[in-house]
Amino acid sequence: SSDWVALYSVLVDFYKPDFHLLRTALKQRKVNTLDELSAALDEVRQTREKIKSSGAFRTSIEQMEAGLKRELARVRLEEQTKQRREEDTRRKADLAQLAEVTALLPSLVHGFDYSRAIDLLTGLRFETTDVRTAVEGRLYLYSSARDFTKQLQLDLIGKGWTGTLTQRSGVTLTGTASLAAGSSDLQIKVEGGTITIPFDSIAPQSLIEMAQSFTTQVTDSTDYYHRQELAATFARAAGLDQLSTTLAAQLMEENRPFRSRWMKVMEAGI
C-alpha cells in the first residue's frame, strides 16, 4: 500500500519549514559584539518559538540559545570591566588635573579680583562626575564672591557707610566710607580730613559687616536671600570658614535652592 508514502509526505510537508528555520538559525554568523550577539539571540529565540518539532531540532535550537546567552554574558562582563578600567584611568587623570587647578587658584586671586580664577574654571571640561561637581562648586564660589564685592561697591557708591572698618594690616578706621564710580579706592571721612585707601586693603570680615548693614535695609525677600548667599560664599572664598558656615546654615533652613548650590561647595571639600 502506498498509504505510508502519503503519510510520510504529509509529515515532510509539516516539518519542512522547520528545516529552513533551523538551517537559517544554525548558519555561521559574526557574533563578536554585544549588538551582534543580541541580534543572533533574538533570531534564535524567534526560531524556537516558530518550530513545530519537539525533538532534535528543538534541542539544537535550545542548545544554541543557551550558548549565545553564555557568550552574551561573557562579552557584557568584558565590556563592563573595560569600561570600569577606562573610567578609573580617566578619573585618576581628572583628579590629578583638579589637584593642579586647586593648587593654582589662590595665586589667580588678586585682592578681591576673582576674574582669573573664574576664567580658568569656566574653561575646564571633565567627564568624571565628582570632579565636575568639584569644579562647579569652585566656580559657583568664586563667581558669587565676585558678585558680593560688586554689590557692596554699588551700595558704597549709592549710599556710603558709616562705622569702624579694619584693614588687612589690622589698622582700624572710624568714619564714613564712600566709593566713586569706576574707582578702586575708598574715601574715608574721618575727624580732621579724608583718607584714601584701596578697597582691596580692607579685611574680609569688615567687608561682610559693611554688606550686612546694607542687607538689613533690604525689604524684598528675594534680594535679601541673594545678599545673604553672596555673603556666605564670599566668607568661604576669603577663608572665613566659621562665619561662612554660620551664614550658610541659617540660609539653608529658609532657602532650598541655596541648599543645593551650597552642597556642591561642601562636596568639593572647599
Question: What does each of the following model-derived ranges do?
Answer:
Residues 1-73, 77-270:
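Compositionally biased alpha-helical segments
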